[in-house]
A protein has these predicted regions:
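N-terminal carbohydrate-binding/catalytic regions of secreted carbohydrate-active enzymes
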Residues: 235-326, 475-483, 491-494, 507
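Substrate-binding cleft of secreted/luminal carbohydrate-active enzymes
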Residues: 206-242, 449-528
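Signature of long, low-cysteine stretches enriched in small and polar/charged residues
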Residues: 120-165
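Aromatic- and acid-rich polysaccharide-binding/catalytic face
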Residues: 263-269, 399-430, 458, 489-491
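Substrate-binding cleft of extracellular glycoside hydrolase catalytic domains
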Residues: 278-380
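Glycoside hydrolase catalytic-domain groove-lining segments
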Residues: 279-296, 411-462
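N-terminal targeting sequences that direct proteins away from the cytosol to non-cytosolic compartments
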Residues: 2-94, 166-167, 176-209
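Aromatic-lined carbohydrate-recognition surfaces of secreted/lumenal glycan-active proteins
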Residues: 369-397, 448-461, 485-491
Length: 528
């Protein structure tokens, strides 16, 4: 009897110890606080009192432009992009981006659901672990938690997001970390959210008038050199052609004869399924011309193609290296605009497809840049090229958040079209209406880089295209001296009649404009 009672006591002790062990595993072990399942259920989205040890003093940050104050935890770095975002980073541990979004004509739900379309669809390997609505600090709050595939060491692929509605403004806190730093990072996030307080906003500051910058372009290649003197602008063209094979000349030469002008700068596009004919590329340079290629990271026409994830995993290295080797063999300058118009949701490399994380685009840019350098394609000139209007026009989609940095960008591309009124949402915009504010803003952020209008045009419908062209060609050289190259998009695009011969008057206006002294010069010369 005594032995049975003793044995029973041991059983109870064993049971209690086992229960404690199971509870420990559930909280800290695999699948616990550092696992994906825990990301979906830990804290249930409500910030708790932070208990991390403070080895240095926290500091207050006030963003008067967007209107809020927070306390920055020890060890975190802070950057304010006025009117765009406040970015807090703990290097190697976590990143928090704060966006203050006025709602204007939409509801908070519309803003959140459209912004989070990729989460709902599961694009880009995204897995949503939790989403809910609750009340936080007295404000309606929407919370989302998700993960995606890790694409490289140090990649922060665990996300938590808070949207707090204050009157007609949503404060979005987009936070990311990784499994290894989840506990520490979420404590810091809780600390920041506890400290947050909305304030009156002063709005985005006005950009100063740019100083007039006269720049000469001199780029030497193996066989040719590109020279654009001060006070001159080089005209380029996108003319109908077959991608990959190009076959530019049979349509281009007759156009040049009618205009009495040789276009020394041509552009084309490429997707992952594009294979260039090297000989065709070389013919362009042998004829005294320079080429710009828009390398677009998708499979042409594939809907909802989120190939940046596979690109960063190395799946397309062979294609990228083949492009790099071909461009290297050309020897002369090749302009490359990787992932152009990334701030438009018509581009599947936009952050709209990737949980609003613009860092994925920047990682892809750096990845491609590194491969080209490894292949010795030092003649390639990298062009960073947003669209002039972000869509959706939300703070998280601002072009500055996509900028990979001065070290990997050579030129800045501008793109803005006069869409005319072919579609109900279209608006007739004059050249200066498009480019004056854009030029002023870009000169503030990128004044050390030369500019290129990578593609633009005017529609025929909705106004006087001939007068539009005349005013544009007068203003371009008079008011935008840092724009050294301008490329006309000479094609019909849906209902948009961008082609130069959309009317005899438009064609004649362009031909007359090319006669201006600023456009009459030779830019491509033999090296010797």
């Amino acid at each position: 009897m005594e032995g049975r009672e003793q044995l029973g006591g041991y059983k109870w002790l064993t049971f209690i110890l086992l229960l404690i062990f199971v509870l420990f595993l559930a909280r800290f072990g695999p699948g616990g606080r550092t696992g994906e399942e825990a990301w979906g259920r830990e804290n249930k989205g409500v910030p708790k009192e932070s208990t991390f040890e403070q080895k240095e003093a926290p500091r207050e940050l006030i963003n008067t432009y967007d209107g809020f104050r927070i306390t920055v935890p020890p060890g975190w770095e802070a950057e304010i992009l006025p009117g765009v975002a406040t970015i807090l980073t703990r290097p190697g541990v976590a990143k928090l981006s704060i966006f203050v979004q006025p709602l204007e004509k939409i509801t908070a739900e519309e803003y959140i659901l459209y912004s989070n379309r990729s989460l709902q669809e599961g694009w880009a390997t995204i897995k949503v672990w939790d989403s809910k609505k609750l009340n936080l600090k007295g404000y309606p709050t929407w919370i989302w938690e998700w993960t995606r595939d890790k694409v490289a060491p140090g990649d922060l692929n665990y996300y938590r997001e808070y949207h707090l509605l204050v009157s007609r403004t949503v404060y979005t806190f987009l936070f990311k970390t990784d499994a290894e730093n989840l506990q520490e990072a979420t404590r810091s996030l809780s600390y920041i959210l506890q400290s947050w307080e909305p304030l009156p906003s002063t709005g985005k500051p006005a950009f100063p008038e740019p100083q007039r910058l006269e720049r000469e372009i001199y780029i030497e290649g193996a066989y040719h050199k590109l020279i654009i003197p001060k006070g001159k602008t080089l005209w380029g063209i996108l003319n109908p052609h077959k991608l990959g094979k190009l076959e530019y000349f049979h349509r281009l030469i007759p156009l040049e004869e009618k205009l009495n002008h040789k276009f020394e700068f041509l552009i084309t596009y490429a997707a992952f399924d594009t294979r260039f004919d090297l000989r065709e590329l070389q013919k362009i340079y042998e004829d005294g011309r320079i080429l710009m290629v828009a390398l677009q990271p998708w499979w042409y026409g594939k809907k909802n193609d989120t190939s940046l994830i596979d690109l960063l995993k190395g799946k397309y290295d062979d294609i990228l290296r083949e492009w790099a080797r071909q461009f290297k063999m050309i020897g002369d300058p090749v302009f490359v605009r990787f992932g152009n118009e990334m701030n438009g949701d018509w581009s599947t490399w936009s952050a709209w497809f990737y949980g609003k994380d613009t860092d994925i685009f920047k990682m892809a840019w750096d990845y491609v840049y590194r491969i080209f350098k490894e292949e010795g394609a030092t003649n390639v000139i990298f062009v960073f090229n947003p669209h002039d209007r972000s869509f959706p026009n939300f703070k998280w989609n601002h072009y500055l958040l996509y900028y990979p940095g001065d070290q990997t960008v050579d030129w800045i591309g501008l793109t803005g079209y006069n869409n005319g009124t072919s579609y109900p949402a279209d608006l007739w915009r004059e050249f200066d209406t498009i480019y004056e504010p854009l030029y002023k803003e870009y000169m503030y952020y990128f004044k050390d880089k030369p500019f290129i209008i990578t593609e633009f045009a005017s529609n025929e419908i909705g106004g006087d295209k001939a007068k539009w062209i005349k005013r544009a060609m007068e203003s371009l050289v008079a008011n935008y001296p840092n724009i050294k190259i301008a490329v006309w998009f000479n094609q019909i695009d849906g209902k948009w009649l961008y082609n130069l011969d959309s009317s005899p008057a438009s064609f004649q206006a362009f031909a007359e404009g090319l006669k201006k002294e600023a456009y009459q010069f030779r830019a491509v010369w033999p090296r010797n």
